[in-house]
């Protein structure tokens, strides 16, 4: 009974929304999408177009996947093609170009292997001898990812990787980030009309930490590189990390010059959203399908909006009468800002 009620409410009272995934098994994505039927998956471009034209998006949603991890893209693309679901993959182009990996990927592998002692690095001294020192450092790293240029944390991250290899007897390959999808694979997958590749910036750096010149470069260069390799115009961006802190005050205005939309990790539906601050609903492997339905209904409800504004859909998170705890994802993206 509860299952049928949630499905009815999702179809009838949820505004259009964008799902955000990172690294996740395809069977979990399939379970989530099946759980929110009869809501219908549509291309991101269609959802953005309908929102921009003030047309109803009720009962519609788009699927997006961040970061361009090779095995993840391949597995999910197979699922989307098999099920006939259009989907958008956001690519950080430097990761695809170099396969060097992003700081949060290195950190995820390094954290459990760090020696619990005082460590002297070229970039500074870190004391990990306390019982909660590693967890405290992890919190500081996440703040840096969301607010600072990568030069303030990436060199230290690589130094820690060298230390773990040297002192813990771990092979570098064992702690290296997963390989990205390759550009030839991107080109091949992009020939299928269901699969689209868009921009996740160049370096996966918080855009609030970039100079005006670097901000424009990240947006223009990543757009042009994705267009070159796919043969399709790159018209959509996902902000790295996606929190308001990491996006900053200038990025949306710049994004409007280069893209039709730019997605955040703020929660809500797309009905009245700024196209260059578009909300998404992040879902993670550990979430239940019941949690996913409740989160979407709570954060994308149009019930209160219909009372006050019959023309435009508006996100009314608080009015839905529920509280959905924000999740922390595998990429270090988290909560309303992921």
Question: Whereabouts are the PLM-identified features?
Answer:
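Metal-dependent polysaccharide deacetylase catalytic core of the NodB/CE4 family, i.e.
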Residues: 19-22, 59, 81-245, 272, ...
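Beta-hairpin (beta-strand-turn-beta-strand) motif
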Residues: 65-68, 92-94
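Glycine-rich, phosphate-binding/catalytic loops in enzymes
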Residues: 79-82, 254-255
């Amino acid at each position: 009974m509860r299952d049928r009620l949630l499905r009815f409410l999702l179809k009838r009272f949820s505004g259009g929304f964008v799902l955000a995934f990172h690294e996740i098994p395809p069977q979990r994505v399939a379970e989530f999408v099946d759980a929110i039927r009869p809501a219908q998956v549509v291309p991101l471009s269609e959802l953005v177009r309908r929102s921009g034209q003030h047309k109803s998006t009720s009962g519609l949603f788009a699927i997006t996947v961040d970061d361009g991890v090779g095995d993840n893209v391949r597995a999910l693309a197979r699922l989307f093609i098999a099920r006939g679901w259009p989907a958008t993959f956001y690519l950080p182009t430097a990761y695809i170009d170099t396969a060097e990996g992003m700081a949060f990927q290195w950190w995820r592998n390094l954290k459990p292997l760090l020696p619990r002692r005082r460590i002297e690095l070229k970039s500074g001294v870190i004391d990990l001898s306390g019982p909660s020192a590693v967890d405290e450092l992890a919190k500081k790293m996440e703040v840096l990812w969301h607010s600072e240029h990568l030069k303030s944390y990436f060199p230290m991250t690589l130094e820690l990787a060298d230390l773990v290899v040297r002192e813990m007897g771990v092979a570098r390959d064992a702690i290296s980030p997963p390989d990205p999808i390759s550009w030839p694979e991107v080109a091949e997958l992009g020939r299928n009309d269901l699969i689209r590749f868009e921009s996740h910036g160049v370096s996966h750096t918080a855009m609030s930490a970039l100079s005006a010149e670097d901000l424009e470069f990240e947006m223009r260069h990543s757009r042009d590189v994705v267009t070159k390799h796919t043969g399709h115009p790159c018209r959509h961006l996902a902000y790295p990390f996606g929190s308001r802190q990491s996006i900053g005050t200038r990025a949306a205005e710049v994004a409007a010059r280069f893209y039709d939309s730019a997605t955040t990790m703020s929660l809500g539906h797309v009905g009245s959203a700024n196209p260059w601050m578009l909300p998404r609903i992040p879902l993670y492997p550990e979430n239940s399908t019941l949690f996913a339905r409740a989160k979407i209904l709570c954060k994308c409800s149009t019930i209160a909006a219909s009372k006050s504004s019959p023309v435009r859909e508006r996100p009314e998170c608080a009015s839905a009468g529920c509280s959905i705890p924000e999740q922390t994802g595998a990429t270090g993206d988290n909560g309303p800002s992921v």
